[in-house]
A protein has these predicted regions:
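A residue-level marker of the well-folded mature domains of exported/periplasmic proteins
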Residues: 4, 23-315
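Bacterial N-terminal signal peptides
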Residues: 10-21
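Bacterial N-terminal signal peptides that target proteins for export
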Residues: 1-10
Length: 315
């Protein structure tokens, strides 16, 4: 009996290195986001990492903060660390192409999330929100809030990010249908709350009679709300956002923001990792196309209670 027990223990001990080797064999997935100080990008990284780990990979998250040189260095690190895949939120539609090419030259597949690059056929997949659709539903909701006449201003995101122009153009397509709505100012605030606050202060000084602010993302919108509060104007000016961040949802619930457009970042961040896993194992992502659009949803005071977690809206 003792000999039998010893043999079982020896067999079990012998299999441990094999089990450890098998677990390690899945490899490292490197995740590169823009800036986790923004809850949107924080969620992007957290969801991608958790999904990778649930599939048996190790994963790390780093941030380039919109700087292509930093991004390039992080790609170098991913190559040095022998990553089996890279999940990248690109810093620049044109400027990130070289970094993606560098990873591909090292035989590491790249999966882009949230933003596109201006070259097809490099990344294995580009998974992004349907920004045009999101902008359209947001702009229509904004018109319902402010009415069909009056002066308004726009806060624009990072010009190096195609999403900024796509959303702005989507707003324009809807709002130009209302001839008595006049855009009297537009400022670049680079997706940033502090810049949104500062630009809103300047816009208010130049255009004190505005009735609305339409923003390319929630952080800029929240900055605008802070400036409007400070000026005692929030009750007169309606603000709309885009992202579906927890702070924006709280502002909608408080009646300070009219709506936010929810980007399904939690969905496509997880999906990018799943497609990376499938590609690693089969040589195919399983998707019908490289560029994949994920529809956005509107969050208003009528459905805000269905917000069940960061960037998650129950049906």
């Amino acid at each position: 009996m003792i000999d039998k027990a010893r043999r079982i223990l020896l067999v079990a001990a012998a299999t441990l290195p094999l089990m450890a080797s098998h677990a390690w064999a899945a490899g490292l997935i490197s995740i590169i986001v823009t800036d986790p100080a923004n809850p949107y990008w924080l969620t992007e990284g957290q969801v991608a990492k958790a999904t990778a780990e649930s599939l048996g990979y190790t994963a790390n998250v780093s941030a380039h903060k919109g700087d292509t040189n930093t991004e390039s260095t992080m790609i170098d690190t991913a190559i040095t660390n022998k990553s089996v895949a890279i999940i990248l939120d690109p810093a620049n539609a044109d400027g990130s192409i070289g970094a993606v090419k560098k990873a591909i030259a090292a035989n590491i597949p790249v999966f882009l999330v949230n933003a596109e690059i201006n070259q097809d056929g490099l990344a294995k997949a580009q998974l992004v929100s349907n920004n045009a659709q999101g902008a359209a539903i947001g702009a229509q909701q904004w018109v319902e809030a402010i009415g069909d006449k009056g002066n308004y201003v726009e806060l624009f995101g990072n010009p190096a990010d195609n999403n900024a122009a796509t959303r702005s153009n989507g707003y324009e397509t809807v709002l130009t249908q209302y001839s008595d709505l006049k855009k009297v100012g537009k400022e670049v605030a680079n997706w940033d709350r502090t810049q949104g606050y500062q630009k809103m202060q300047s816009l208010l000084q130049a255009h004190p009679d505005i009735v609305g602010v339409i923003s390319g993302n929630d952080e800029m919108a929240l900055g605008a709300i802070a400036a409007l509060k400070e000026a005692g104007k929030l009750s007169q000016v309606k603000v709309g956002g885009f992202d579906g961040s927890p702070d924006a949802v709280a502002a909608v619930k408080a009646g300070e923001m009219q709506y936010t457009v929810l980007q399904p970042v939690a969905v496509f961040s997880a999906e990018a990792v799943k497609q990376a896993d499938k590609f690693i194992k089969t040589g195919s992502t399983g998707a019908a196309s490289e560029k994949q659009l994920f529809d956005c949803a509107l969050i208003t005071k009528d459905n805000v209670d269905k917000y069940t977690g960061p960037f998650t809206l129950s049906q």
